[in-house]
Amino acid sequence: AQQLFCTMTKERDGLHFDFSGTSPQTDTDHNSTLPSTTAHIALALTNTLFWDVPWSDGKMRPVKTDIPEGSILNCRYPAACGTSPRIGNVLVSTVCECVSKMIYASGRHDDVNACTNGNAEFVGGPGYFYGGHNRDGIPVAQGLYDIHGAGMGAAPYRDGVNTGGHMNIPSAGISDVERI
């Protein structure tokens, strides 16, 4: 099994994420490229700390990272990385947990956000998949993405939103049942 290690340090207005000790890249497709890893870190920070900062390259200026080359988070070419989004899901949960613990430890309990969709990232990703056979006996599969309507942002002293979308897809959502 691959392991993802993350040490987060806050110094003044900056954050530093060190992923030393993370598993080396694999011969399977359980690898992520550096751009994908960086994007998933940005998503986690957008939904926990930087929610009110405009989307721009400046958003990540106060963030420094050490991501070992040749690890599952920074694989070397020509490593397969078809499961990069799955690695990213786990990374988002990891970064969110680090940030939430930092805010909680600072005593700013009102500012602690729960990560979105509970722990869905660890149980299969942003949807549910099921299958069976159609009336002609042909195997079929189906994906259900109702999780895009999951809540987010609850804190110890306040409710979150009821349908915030999926954390890894900030603009996603589901149809309003009253309008269908």
What is the role of each PLM region?
Residues 1-180:
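Glycine/proline-enriched, intrinsically flexible loops and inter-domain linkers
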